[in-house]
Amino acid sequence: MGDDSQRTDLAVSDRWQHWKRNFWLGVINGILFKVGITFSHPSTVLAVFLTKLTGSELYAGILTAVAGLGWFLPPMFVAGWVESLPRKLPLYANMALGRALGWLWMIFVVVFVAPKFPVYAAILFLLGYAVYTITGGISSLAFMDIYARTVPFRRRGAFWGLRMFWGSVLGIGGGVIVRQVLKGDWGFDFPYNYALLLSFAFVTYALAWLTFFLIHEPPVEWTPPPKSWREQLQTMVELWKQRADFRQLIKVRLLMDIGLIASPFYSTYAVVKLGAKPSLLGAFIIAETVGSLLANILWSILADRRSNLFVLKCSIACAAVPSGWVLLLTLLHYSFGFNVLPLYPLTYFFLAFAGTGIAIAFTNYVLELADEAHRPTYLALSNATESGMMLLPVLGGILLHYVSHSVLFSIAFTGVVLAVWESRKLKPAFVYEPSHSEALKVT
């Protein structure tokens, strides 16, 4: 790794002269997004909405798959083109428009279609969500490239930590609102109560997009020529062959992703099997928000003072707790007759505590491995290798017709334990910025 003097020189160069302004605009952007997710979390609010709308948990699994595939797969096809763009902010703006249209379509479906045609509404809702996630996946390449060129290395842990910390603080209030709306305190019955939550989410997302538009994007030092899809695929193959450290990271992530088979069903399990009322989702969201809040204090400090790799290993170990906790609650409920619902929100505390650390550390670790010229390709390749795993929630929804929820939770637990074992092989990244000629060697 380069020494601190090198990073100091970088931080005061012309390229980084606006980094403080960009840093805080990026933080505000993240806070607003975090609040928006509180109103419309796919694994809680939207999963229960589709289950209640259709009477089937399968649609909740499809929703999670759409979220993952839309976010992870499209970047693989456009990464080469994105690399060649001298400025990435216009792409982010165009994709924000697509995300806005997709979200407004979802609200329209809930208000005008869901009351009379629930199954058709679920399908149309998923189509709108697909538009939102696909455009979001493409915009993520622009976002991460701008982020890597605007936030100095030693401030990246604080950047993500502040985004998630203050987003979580405000998200606690959002969780209270979700609980009140779903209880009927605001005077809206199903499905209009969910349309109200989606509207709240849209307002915060729109403010987040507008905030990011104000960022001063520094010029790139060099951009490669546009690549055809075949050339881009060849670049990905070469990167994959040359970087054993990157392959090991992806192996760990894929094992961890086995936990996705159960992710949308923690909330539906509580409602369908344990008898929880939908208003308990507010407690889930509050617990998740508190978990994220506390995790940010810990993980962001450790990311800057120790390393992103250290945080990644610790948070992967913590990721085994949620599925193990639900299995324990299931045992207490069915074998001993305990009322476990008061303890069930802790599931979301544990999910957020682990997930926050992974969110802070994983992408930062990928950026540490990547050179500037091929940063979008590393991100796209990382996303593409995960895309197939995004179908696991659909498989989980199908399996629930034949096996119990406990089987899904056991599969999730096993996958994360294997990821913990494999994460021992991850090594600190060597951070450097190659010359143009060095960058071209990969292609």
Q: For the regions a protein language model found, what residue spans apply to each?
A:
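C-terminal ends and interior cores of transmembrane alpha-helices
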Residues: L97-V119, A317-G337
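Cytoplasmic membrane-interface "Motif A"-like loop-to-helix N-cap segments
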Residues: E83-L101, L162, R305-A319
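C-terminal transmembrane helical hairpin of 12-TM major facilitator-type secondary transporters
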Residues: F310-I358
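Helix-loop boundary and gating motifs at the non-cytosolic
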Residues: G2-L73, V82, Y92, A96-R99, ...
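Loop-to-transmembrane helix entry/capping segments in MFS-fold secondary transporters
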Residues: E57-L58, F153-L162, P278-S279, E372-S382
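Intracellular juxtamembrane helix-capping segments at the cytosolic ends
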Residues: G136-V151, T356-A370
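Helix-to-loop junctions at the C-terminal end of transmembrane segments
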Residues: P74-R87, L182, A295-N308, L400-H401
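Juxtamembrane intracellular "pre-TM" segments in multi-pass secondary transporters
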Residues: D3-K20, E217-K251, A439-T443
